[in-house]
């Protein structure tokens, strides 16, 4: 049985910090990383990693982030032939993590 996932896909930009900044404060000890994000993309990648044949239906922008999302999903074994390229930027989520909580 094939799993079809309809949902969002974006790039998560995660900053791990020692404390949340006060208004006007710059936190200089942040550790940054990027990862696959979006409920649909995360579900598709997880199902494919568990061995299910997965097709993702969704959209990404015609930009570097969209190409990155396609590459990561494909490397997980997700069929991305039904992911549309659209003329808007790929979604980005800015996430701040402090003490393990976002």
Show which residues each predicted segment covers.
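Residues that form or immediately flank small-molecule/cofactor binding pockets and catalytic motifs
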Residues: 61, 88, 99
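Glycine-rich phosphate/adenosyl-contacting loop at the front of the ribokinase-like
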Residues: 1-59, 64-75, 93
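Conserved phosphate-binding/catalytic loop of the ribokinase/pfkB sugar-kinase fold
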Residues: 85, 95-102
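A glycine-rich helix N-cap at a beta->alpha junction
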Residues: 72-88
């Amino acid at each position: 049985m094939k799993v079809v996932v309809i949902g969002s896909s974006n790039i998560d930009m995660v900053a791990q910090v020692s404390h949340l900044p006060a208004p006007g404060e710059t936190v200089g000890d942040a550790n940054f990383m990027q990862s696959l994000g979006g409920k649909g993309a995360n579900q598709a990648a997880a199902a494919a990693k568990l061995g299910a044949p997965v097709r993702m239906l969704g959209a990404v922008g015609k930009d570097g982030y969209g190409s990155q999302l396609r590459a990561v999903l494909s490397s997980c074994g997700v069929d991305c032939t039904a992911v549309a390229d659209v003329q808007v930027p790929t979604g980005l989520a800015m996430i701040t993590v402090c003490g393990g909580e976002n």
